[in-house]
Amino acid sequence: MSEKIVFYGKEQLQRIRIFNYSESNDKTLIVLHGGGWRDPRNSYNDFEDMANYILEEKKATNINIIGIDYRLSPFIKHPVHLIDVLTAFRYILENYKTGQLSIVGHSVGATLLLEILNYVEIIQTGLEQLETSEPSIEELQTLFDFISKNLTFKTMYFLDGIYDVRALLEEYPSYDFFVKSAFVSTVAIEEASQLSWKQHNEAFKIAVDKYEILHSLEDELLSLNQPKLFAKYLQDRKIECSFRTGNWGEHEQVYRSQAVSEHVLQNM
């Protein structure tokens, strides 16, 4: 299939980009962009270089590659970003033969990957803070049931991510300007991540074979504190993970790194 844009919802950013797809392929790579929950300059197009490396340079056309966009703050608030991503997954799984799924999340895309692992608790608590009646309980339950039955991953790649927003603000108080755009309260911030939540203590609900944490040593926006916190969280719970660093460029360059793309390709 040639490249294609498909909508999974009614809004402009509720869309996916099909970089490559064939029903005969038995692996699918999903790519999920960052941008601080709010930056329209970030989209599934961030991963064009990675897709081109895998498909053109390495000739790995036996891999489906699909990018997900989601609505942005301040127009929507947490946990609606996560609901959009799960809705996109339902659309993909209902309409395409994906085979074995792996996913790359960059920056807050990596945050969303972590949230996916306990999507029920995080969405329910987030909606309580948001005080909204949409989506309905019935709509959410249908989505939750589908995800529970159908979504598993071979590999999750967490790329220069944010895993504990509370700790992020302690380290970088100036980042408050974009965090407040995405969250309605301090409680919403704390309960959005397993590393800081207080109301839950749940095991991950989505099966994942491999956790790959990657962080560029040249990242000018995020220190190694965030990936170290996440790696410790996993290790404390006896969950195996790989934690790698390298000179892969600045924050908005790391997903363009051929070394990162090669690592993704080799570990699917």
From Swiss-Prot:
Pathway: Amino-acid degradation; L-tryptophan degradation via kynurenine pathway; L-kynurenine from L-tryptophan: step 2/2. The active site is at S107 (nucleophile), D219, H251. Keywords: Hydrolase, Tryptophan catabolism. The main chain amide nitrogen atoms of the second glycine and its adjacent residue in the HGGXW motif define the oxyanion hole, and stabilize the oxyanion that forms during the nucleophilic attack by the catalytic serine during substrate cleavage. Catalyzes the hydrolysis of N-formyl-L-kynurenine to L-kynurenine, the second step in the kynurenine pathway of tryptophan degradation. Kynurenine may be further oxidized to nicotinic acid, NAD(H) and NADP(H). Required for elimination of toxic metabolites. Belongs to the kynurenine formamidase family. This is Kynurenine formamidase.
